[in-house]
Amino acid sequence: MNRYDETMKVIFLDIDGVLNSSKTVDRNFDYPELDPRNFAVLQKIVNKTGAVLVLISSWKDDWLNEDGTVSRSQEMIRYQLNQFGLDIYDHTADMTYNRGEGIINWLNVHAAESWCVLDDEIFPDYEQLQIVEKLVKTSYMDGLTDDCVNEVILKLMG
């Protein structure tokens, strides 16, 4: 999509504390780092809103191996997303400490009708760049749960 596709709805997606939680490692899933239950909640949101997923997580830092091949991190995330009919549309180009700046820079290139951020943390630049009002804060204890669904839908469809 390009700068002029203003009908796009975007979910800026963190992984840790959103698609997994502090309890995830204790479970016996295909990929213990990721929780299918959190993915099922994300699927509900995407099905209702038609939003695309833009990765903001530090997991994107090793998205590709040094030789340009797909990393295990990318493989795990995409595999699990694909199980729910989802995929990553794009990712931001920032360092972890300036995650909000990465979101704003992405939006400057890819206009969106609406957007929200799914993250379990509030980064300092979220407040500086007024991203907090677009944030749906998850809990690292549980990740993305049904309790978040209506808030995300409201921010995207509002």
Q: What residue ranges belong to the model's regions?
A:
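Active-site neighborhood of HAD-like aspartate-dependent phosphohydrolases
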Residues: 2-50
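Structural motif
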Residues: 10, 52, 114-116
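Short His-Asn-centered micro-motif
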Residues: 13, 56-59, 118-120
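Short catalytic/ligand-binding loop motif for oxyanion handling, primarily in non-cytosolic enzymes
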Residues: 20-21, 62-66, 124-127, 145
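Short amphipathic alpha-helical segments
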Residues: 24-25, 47, 67-68, 128-130
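Short, flexible/disordered intra-domain loops and linkers
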Residues: 26-33, 63-72
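Substrate-recognition element of Asp-dependent hydrolases with the DxDx(T/V) motif
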Residues: 46-69
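C-terminal cap/substrate-recognition subdomain and adjoining C-terminal extension
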Residues: 75-158
